UniProtKB/Swiss-Prot annotation:
Subcellular location: Cytoplasm
Function, as annotated: Necessary for the introduction of cis unsaturation into fatty acids. Catalyzes the dehydration of (3R)-3-hydroxydecanoyl-ACP to E-(2)-decenoyl-ACP and then its isomerization to Z-(3)-decenoyl-ACP. Can catalyze the dehydratase reaction for beta-hydroxyacyl-ACPs with saturated chain lengths up to 16:0, being most active on intermediate chain length.
Pathway annotation: Lipid metabolism; fatty acid biosynthesis
CDD domains: FabA
GO CC terms, sorted: cytoplasm
Protein name: 3-hydroxydecanoyl-[acyl-carrier-protein] dehydratase
GO biological process: unsaturated fatty acid biosynthetic process
A molecular-function term among this protein's GO annotations: (3R)-hydroxyacyl-[acyl-carrier-protein] dehydratase activity
Reaction catalysed by this enzyme: a (3R)-hydroxyacyl-[ACP] = a (2E)-enoyl-[ACP] + H2O; (3R)-hydroxydecanoyl-[ACP] = (2E)-decenoyl-[ACP] + H2O; (2E)-decenoyl-[ACP] = (3Z)-decenoyl-[ACP]
Lipid biosynthesis recorded as keyword: yes
């Protein structure tokens, strides 16, 4: 049985990456450096824009984060794909929180819009995931819309984020 708390610490997220939070068969978050959040501050089975579930998580920004040193030299900015990946990570985390099992894989996204950037001078990135649908069949899949904010300002939106959980990924 999954401990369905409303919030999770960095240590909890690291435990997920080791397969300890949702059990050996549950989906895992990536380990650092690809883990793109420091905490989950809210998880609910209702709520969000569609009243089908909501997740909110945060990443603390500091100039020493690994991507600022290489993207780009003299013009440091967090790659937009990392914010997108964070949203996929949270969709998979939510599926594990619901008690689903399998290996998480991003399956796609409808549309992504970037209207801002994350610079090393920022303090905090906030991710908001609004669930539209959970499919519980042979393939378990989450479908959601997401938002990325930097210091409270909306900078990315993504529609139709899709993550599936697979028992066997050898043929994927």
């Amino acid at each position: 049985m999954v401990d369905k708390r409303e919030s999770y610490t960095k240590e909890d997220l690291l435990a997920s990456g080791r397969g300890e939070l949702f059990g050996a068969k549950g989906p895992q978050l990536p380990a650092p450096n690809m883990l793109m959040m420091d905490r989950v501050v809210k998880m609910t089975e209702t709520g969000g824009n569609f009243d089908k579930g909501y997740v909110e998580a945060e990443l603390d920004i500091n100039p020493d984060l690994w991507f600022f040193g290489c993207h780009f030299i003299g013009d440091p900015v967090m790659p937009g794909c990392l914010g997108l990946d964070a949203m996929w990570q949270l969709v998979g985390f939510y599926l594990g929180w619901l008690g689903s099992e399998g290996k998480g894989r991003a399956l796609g996204v409808g549309e992504v819009k970037f209207t801002g950037q994350v610079l090393p001078t920022a303090k905090k990135v906030t991710y908001r995931i609004h669930f539209k649908r959970i499919v519980n069949r042979r393939l378990i899949m989450g479908l959601a819309d997401g938002e990325v904010l930097v210091d409270g300002r909306l900078i990315y939106t993504a529609s139709d984020l899709k993550v599936g959980l697979f028992q066997d990924t050898s043929a994927f």
